[in-house]
Regions:
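Non-catalytic beta/alpha edge segments that cap or flank active sites
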Residues: 1-133
């Protein structure tokens, strides 16, 4: 995997949506990992901003993330609105901003699903689309 960049965006629905829209249109970007903004405060705008961009929701991501998080933070996991989806051939993962949540998401879900060696299935073939066609 190659990191193409890091972008910090204010918790504003339209700024978040604009930045992610630009990234999913970029043929070099295959995956986006967003952290923060998935809770229940007035500033947690990531779901509202990003969900409308998805062609396909990956419902199982949020479900599995909360199941794994339950092992670590018990019932507090219900406050997470972690989610993922495919948009223009780019997979977008949105996870809570805490270091523990980011580690859980990467180590126990995302890294495996972005590896072509993970069986029986992974997201790699979903990402190998020509965005220019």
């Amino acid at each position: 995997h190659n990191l193409l960049g890091k972008i910090i965006v204010k918790d504003d629905v339209y700024q978040l949506r604009s930045v992610v829209s630009q990234q999913i249109a970029d043929p070099q970007v295959n995956a986006i990992l967003m952290t923060g903004g998935t809770g229940f405060t007035a500033r947690d705008n990531t779901p509202k901003a990003i969900s409308p961009l998805f062609d396909v929701d990956i419902v199982g991501f949020g479900e599995l993330f909360r199941q794994l998080s339950f092992e670590e933070i018990q019932s507090s996991t219900i406050q997470s609105r972690a989610f993922a989806g495919l948009a223009n051939g780019t997979i977008v993962f949105c996870v809570p901003g805490s270091p523990g949540a980011c580690e859980t998401a990467w180590d126990r879900i995302i890294a495996e699903q972005l590896s072509s060696e993970h069986k029986p299935c992974n997201f790699v073939d979903k990402l190998l689309v020509d965005k220019n066609s």
